[in-house]
Amino acid sequence: MKISQLFIGLVACSAVFSHAAIEGASSNNANIKVGSAANASHPGGAAAVSVQAAGAPYNAFTGFSSLKGLAQAFAAQGTSNTNVTVGTKTFNISHIPVSAMPASHSALGNFNFGQVGSQEVYFGEWWKAGDTPASASHTVYYAGDNTNTTVPTSGTATYTVAGINGSATNLLSGNLTANFGAGTLQGSLTGTGTAVSSLTLNGVAFNPGTAQFAGAASANGTAGVNNSGVVQGHFFGANAAALAGIAQFNNAAYNTAFGGAKN
C-alpha cells in the first residue's frame, strides 16, 4: 500500500472522537491542533493530532499511535521510528518527512514526535513543506491522556527529559525537578546539532489540582540567547508519572517540545 493511501485511511478513520481526557497544546493552532480520536482501524491510542494548515480532507484528527505505525512501515521512503534511551528512560521517536509523501500530500508537512515510554504522552514538532525548522511555520505541540492523573502535594521528584528542536536524531536531554509542596518545576536541557543548544525553565509553577504548569524559558543557540520563551505543559499519570510541554519563542526556530518520565 502506498503511503498516501495509508495516510488517507488513517485520517478518515480518525474523525470519530474518543472520550479520553486529552490535555495538550500547540504553539500555533492555525498549523497544528491536538485532541482525541478513536481510530477503529488502528486502535491502541487516544491522543491525536490535526494538521490544520493542510485543510480538508487532511486536517481530521489522526491518532499518534497510527502515525507511529506509518513511521514504522515506510522506512524505505525515509520515515523512521526508533527507541532512544536518555539516562535510564526510553523514548520512542518518530520521523515523517514530507519527502516520504507524494506531491499531492505535501500539505501534510514534516513531523518529528516522541512518546514517553509506553505512556499515552506525546510531544513533537511540525513545519510546512518547503520550509525548515528555522521557518515561521515551525510549530511545537504536546498531548497526553489525562485519565487517572494525580499530582502529589508534598515532596520532590526528578524527571529524565528529552526535547525535540529541529531534529528527530539530535535530541536535547536533561533533568527537571518538581517541588510538589512549592508547586514549582525547574531545570534545563542541553544538546547539539539543533537551533537550541540549551533550554532553561524559569519561574515555572503548577497547581496540583489541575496538573498544568506554566512559566518562562530562556534558550541559547544559533541566534544567541533568547529570553522570550513561554512554557506550558502538563503532568500525566498516577503520582505525576510523566510530563510533557512546549517552550515557545518569538524566534520560531527556538520552539522546543519536551517530554519526561519520573525517576
Describe the predicted segments one by one.
Residues A20-N263:
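Mature soluble binding/inhibitory domains
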Residues M1-A21:
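Gram-negative bacterial Sec-dependent N-terminal signal peptides
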